Amino acid sequence: MSDTGHDRIIHDHVITEPELLEEALAETADGAAARDIAEVPAVEIINTVAVHLLSAAAVKCGLADDPEQQTDLDEARKLINAMAGLVTASAADLGDHHARALRDGLRSVQLAFREASPFPDAPGEGAGEKWTGAVN
């Protein structure tokens, strides 16, 4: 990897030049035209990131097809913490409709985390609870 600060991994390839990165991003999604990030509303970006965090956290909590191989509670805690911080910080900007759905999903993975944990955290100390308060 170069130390330009512009390195990115796309489809398992390290892209080191900004121009090549732009080309690679434009060619993703089976040749479909990449959407100009400047055209995407912030609420849509926040929702997309939150859904990715939520999905990854669910898998790491053992809620996917192969829980024996995919469960990783340390990783789940990190993802849930990130989602809790994002949702809490952006709730006012998202509006009630979007924020409520994200909070419901967040609560679900927080409860799944508690259930999967062999050593339950104290109330208020669980994954993401620093930002959401105790979940039960």
In which residue ranges do the predicted regions lie?
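A charge-rich, low-complexity, intrinsically flexible signal that marks solvent-exposed coils, linkers
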Residues: S2-N136
